[in-house]
UniProtKB/Swiss-Prot annotation:
The keyword RNA-binding does not apply. This is Phenylalanine--tRNA ligase alpha subunit. It comes from Paracoccus denitrificans (strain Pd 1222). HAMAP family: Phe_tRNA_synth_alpha1. Tetramer of two alpha and two beta subunits. Belongs to the class-II aminoacyl-tRNA synthetase family. Phe-tRNA synthetase alpha subunit type 1 subfamily. Keywords: Aminoacyl-tRNA synthetase, ATP-binding, Cytoplasm, Ligase, Magnesium, Metal-binding, Nucleotide-binding, Protein biosynthesis. GO terms for cellular component: cytoplasm. It is an enzyme of class 6 (ligase). The gene is pheS. Binds 2 magnesium ions per tetramer. It catalyses: tRNA(Phe) + L-phenylalanine + ATP = L-phenylalanyl-tRNA(Phe) + AMP + diphosphate + H(+). Mg(2+) binds at residue 260. One of its GO terms (biological process) is phenylalanyl-tRNA aminoacylation.
Length: 360
């Protein structure tokens, strides 16, 4: 046992004297490596009598544990000392301002889509989506738009190219998101409350029109839904979206193939000083179209028009974004101008909600 005591002290001294990690590793290998001195002594236990093995084995295990603990402690001490030395050599000015990292912004179209979704979700509407390439049946026939209707002409609608002998029905880039309403009715039946936001396509290009733009349409079906429900829904939407206490809407008789009766909706506003103010003034501004769903459209969606009725409405997301945020030219939405995006964009944390506020 006295030999083990001497061996213990020898290794503890060598561990204390190790000046770096390499020297410490040499001590570890000499003591506890596969060919180390203590490891070799452990291998000799098999040749001893049971009594000797019990006594010597316990002593060797204690020695091994003590050496291992000393090695770990010394290693940590060397690492701490190296860190202290490096910190003393390096100089860091904690008052120096950080380098700004480039930040992206949320596009106004994405932001307004989220705002609209949040408002209608609060009224119990869910979001429905559908394909942007539609058959002419979903885009026209199911919506009571006959073959002779002007909207079906090639100068208004993007028809997909196809071979002359292709037996499939004509395909178009959808001109509105109304086909999604047909698909939603076919999928779930009535009652139903959905909004259908998405891209739509028409052959038009000027300051307030682009070949691709964004639209949101809404559909609500029930047993006793009337124009009064439509009026309340649109008033609540406009009040929440434009963030004003009072709004006044004007319903003008119009014609849409998929609704009967149909109405275009104007909102009272003021242009005093060249600035648009919603909810006051003597002017009126058209913002959306609406009406009671035509019985033929209900039938195309698999709904019995004798038992169910409802309303539908639609508006351009790009247009209401321009009105709310004072954006003068629709084409700028799609030009990918970083300066424009920084000016009109929204921070990633500006998540709209009815309770917390829609806009910054």
């Amino acid at each position: 046992m006295s030999d083990l005591s001497t061996l213990r002290q020898s290794y503890l001294d060598r561990i204390s004297a190790a000046a770096d990690g390499d020297a410490l590793e040499q001590v570890r290998l000499a003591a506890l490596g596969k060919k180390g001195e203590i490891s070799g002594m452990m291998k000799e236990l098999g040749r001893m009598t049971p009594e000797e093995r019990q006594t010597t084995g316990a002593a060797l295990n204690r020695l091994k544990d003590e050496i291992d603990a000393a090695l770990r402690a010394r290693k940590q001490g060397l690492e701490d000392a190296a860190l202290d030395a490096r910190l003393k050599e390096e100089w860091l000015d904690v008052t120096l301002p950080g380098r700004p990292r480039p930040q992206g912004t949320i596009h106004p179209i994405s932001q307004v889509t989220e705002e609209v979704t949040a408002i209608f979700a609060d009224m119990g509407f869910r979001v429905a989506e559908g394909p942007q390439i539609e058959s002419d049946w979903f885009n026209f026939d199911a919506l009571n738009i006959p073959p002779e209707h002007p909207a079906r002409q090639e100068h208004d609608t993007f028809f997909m190219a196809r071979a002359g002998d292709d037996p499939r029905p004509p395909q178009v880039l959808r001109t509105h998101t109304s086909p999604v309403q047909i698909r939603a009715m076919q999928a779930t039946g009535a009652p139903i409350r959905v909004i259908c936001p998405g891209r739509v396509y028409r052959m038009d290009m000027d300051q307030t029109h682009t070949p691709m733009f964004h639209q949101v349409e809404g559909l609500a079906l029930g047993k006793d839904i009337s124009m009064a429900n439509l009026k309340w829904t649109l008033e609540e939407f406009c009040r929440a979206f434009f963030e004003v206490d009072e709004v006044e809407l004007r319903f003008r008789a119009s014609h849409f193939p998929f609704t009967e009766p149909s109405a275009e909706v104007d909102i009272r506003c003021s242009w005093e000083g060249g600035k648009l103010t919603i909810g006051q003034g003597e002017s009126w501004l058209e913002i959306l179209g609406s009406g009671m769903v035509h019985p033929k459209v209900l039938a195309a969606g698999g709904i019995d028009p004798e038992q169910w009725q409802g309303f539908a409405f639609g508006m351009g997301i790009d247009r209401i974004a321009m009105l709310k945020y004072g954006i003068p030219d629709l084409r700028a939405f799609f030009e990918s101008d970083l300066r424009w995006l920084r000016h009109y964009g929204f921070a990633a944390g500006d998540v709209p909600s009815v309770a917390g506020g829609l806009s910054r």
